[in-house]
Structure formats: C-alpha cells, structure tokens
C-alpha cells in the first residue's frame, strides 16, 4: 500500500481524532470549545475572503463589513462542524422530528413524489445541510448527492462513510464507475430525490451568472437534470434560528425555456435572496466571484491562458 504523505496523514488523523473527541464530549463542553475556536478565528477582523464575500452580500466594502457579522458568521461555521462531528451519535428519528417542527415547504416533497419524477433540490453552503439530509432520509428514504474528492483519499472515504451512515447515497464527482449525471438522472426517473450543493463552480463548465451584482459561475448540473428528466428544480436553503436549524424549500423554478443559462440565473437570484436574509449562515470562505481570482486563473477559466 502506498503511504500517504506525512502532512496528509496528519490531516486525516486530525479529522478522525476530532470526530472521536467531539462525539465523546458532553454537549455543553463541545459548544464551549467550538465557540472559543470561533472567537479566536474571528479576531483581528476574521478571514479576509469571508469578509470580501459578505461585503457583496450586504452591499458594502470589505472594510465596512460589521465585525459583529464576521463573528456571527464564524460562529455559525463552527456550529456546523460541531454538529457534523456529533451528528452520527444523535437520535436520527428524534432529530428529524425536531427539524420537522420548523421545516418550511416540506409538502413539496410529497407533491414531487406524486408527480412521479422525483425532484432536484439545489442548495448553497448555508446552515447545516447535513441535518436537512437527515430529515429527508428519515421521511423519504435514501436520496442521492455528489461530493468532490478530497485529499488524502482516506479523508474522502471517511466523509463518504459519515454521510452514508446518515442515509445518503454519495456519488464521487470524478473517478466513479459511471458519470454522476447519468446516475442522478436515473435516480430522478425512478422518482427519487437528488440534492446538490450549487452555489459555486469556478471552472470552465460553470454557468456564468450575475450574483449580487457581480459575475461568477454556478454548476450547470441542477438545470441540466431538470431539463433532461422533467423533474422539478427547487431552490432550498438552510439557516439557523436560535437553537433551531430551519430548512426551507422554495417553489420550483420555471424550467420550460430549456435554457441552462436562464434557469441557472434564476437559481442564482433565489440563492441571493435567501443568503441576504441570513448572511451569517452562508459558509463561503473561498473566492466566490471571478474578480477575486488571480489574472492567471481567470485567463485559464476563459480559455485564453496557457494550458
């Protein structure tokens, strides 16, 4: 067996240790530990890229983003990880019942199932999307999603096992036995549900959209699947309200144009409304807009740079 580079081994061990340690902690202690970590991460203005991203959301400059919003955002991100580490040990049925009490638009799943074509749920990285998945798995059985491969491979395998333990079917974005789009379309035709993270695709295959007044790219997958299979495409959103994790399923987008660009822009517009309503829960710490990429990367993206 090929040995992992030492740094990658430490990364995997770190996550494995975190999972074991946080699961074993009393709930109050885990909350205090992650709150302290969030406070530390938000000191001195917090992560620079997070500040740039939130500036677009609230319509200001990075320097004018309130420190209180940065602190709330980092705390929300820390909460996601605290819950993620502890989620497999929670009572899944009870968790689904708690989520169901504050779920907005849950009836759309039943309507979609009656329609016979399943449904595509497209989400941004907001709140705790894994908890939303637990509710769906508990109420409607296994659904299908896609995950990018991580390095090291052992860490990727750990994340896959984690989500499969919650009732998710997880397809690799690359390197699988079949193209993921083929499998997703097959699941929809079998009247099953597909859930996709869809707020960032800074590659040549991404669809150009206007997002908070600036150019970026979003994945084409949700729109393509809806066009190909006739499944409804629902924007979804997850956010925190006090101790509650709220899942919101919006009305299906109009996909009758058959135009991937038009549909993806409509998805971006709905994401923008929902993110603006709960900016602190949008966990986007990477460059989101083309303007934040290096000139070299933008040139490669447009196909004008060296390959």
Residue ranges of model-derived segments:
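Catalytic core of membrane glycerolipid acyltransferases/transacylases, capturing the structured
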Residues: 114-175, 204-207, 211
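Short, flexible loop segments at the rims of nucleotide/cofactor-binding pockets, characterized by
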Residues: 95-101, 169-175, 212-213, 260
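Short, composition-biased local secondary-structure segments
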Residues: 19-24, 127-133, 184-199
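Membrane-anchoring hydrophobic helices of lipid-metabolizing enzymes
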Residues: 1-123, 156, 160, 167
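Conserved beta-strand termini and adjacent loop/short-helix elements that scaffold enzyme active sites
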Residues: 104, 146-148, 173, 250-252, ...
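Non-catalytic C-terminal accessory region of glycerolipid acyltransferases
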Residues: 2-6, 67, 71, 113, ...
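A conditional alpha-helix N-cap/helix-loop micro-motif detector
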Residues: 101-102, 126, 152, 174-178, ...
């Amino acid at each position: 067996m090929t040995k992992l580079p030492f740094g990658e081994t430490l990364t995997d061990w770190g996550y494995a240790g975190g999972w074991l340690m946080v699961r074993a902690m009393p709930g109050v202690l885990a909350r205090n530990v992650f709150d302290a970590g969030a406070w530390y991460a938000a000191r001195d203005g917090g992560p620079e890229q997070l500040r740039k991203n939130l500036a677009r959301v609230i319509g200001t400059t990075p320097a004018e983003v309130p420190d209180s919003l940065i602190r709330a955002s980092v705390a929300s991100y820390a909460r996601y990880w605290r819950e993620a580490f502890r989620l497999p040990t929670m009572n899944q049925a009870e968790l689904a019942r708690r989520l169901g009490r504050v779920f907005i638009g849950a009836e759309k799943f039943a309507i979609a199932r009656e329609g016979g074509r399943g449904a595509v749920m497209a989400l941004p990285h907001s709140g705790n999307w894994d908890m939303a998945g637990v509710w769906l798995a508990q109420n409607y059985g296994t659904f299908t999603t896609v995950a990018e491969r991580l390095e090291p491979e052992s860490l990727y395998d750990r994340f896959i096992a984690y989500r499969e333990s919650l009732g998710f079917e997880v397809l690799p974005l690359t390197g699988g036995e079949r193209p993921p789009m083929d499998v997703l379309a097959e699941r929809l035709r079998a009247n099953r549900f597909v859930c996709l993270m869809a707020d960032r695709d800074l590659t040549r295959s991404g669809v150009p959209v206007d997002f908070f007044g600036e150019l970026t790219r979003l994945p084409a997958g949700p729109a393509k699947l809806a066009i190909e299979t006739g499944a409804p495409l629902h924007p979804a959103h997850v956010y925190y309200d006090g101790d509650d994790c709220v899942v919101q399923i919006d009305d299906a987008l109009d996909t009758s144009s058959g135009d991937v660009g038009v549909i993806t822009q409509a998805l971006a517009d709905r994401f923008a409304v929902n993110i603006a309503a709960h900016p602190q829960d949008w966990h986007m710490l990477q460059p989101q807009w083309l303007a934040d990429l290096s000139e070299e990367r933008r040139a490669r993206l447009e196909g004008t740079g060296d390959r």
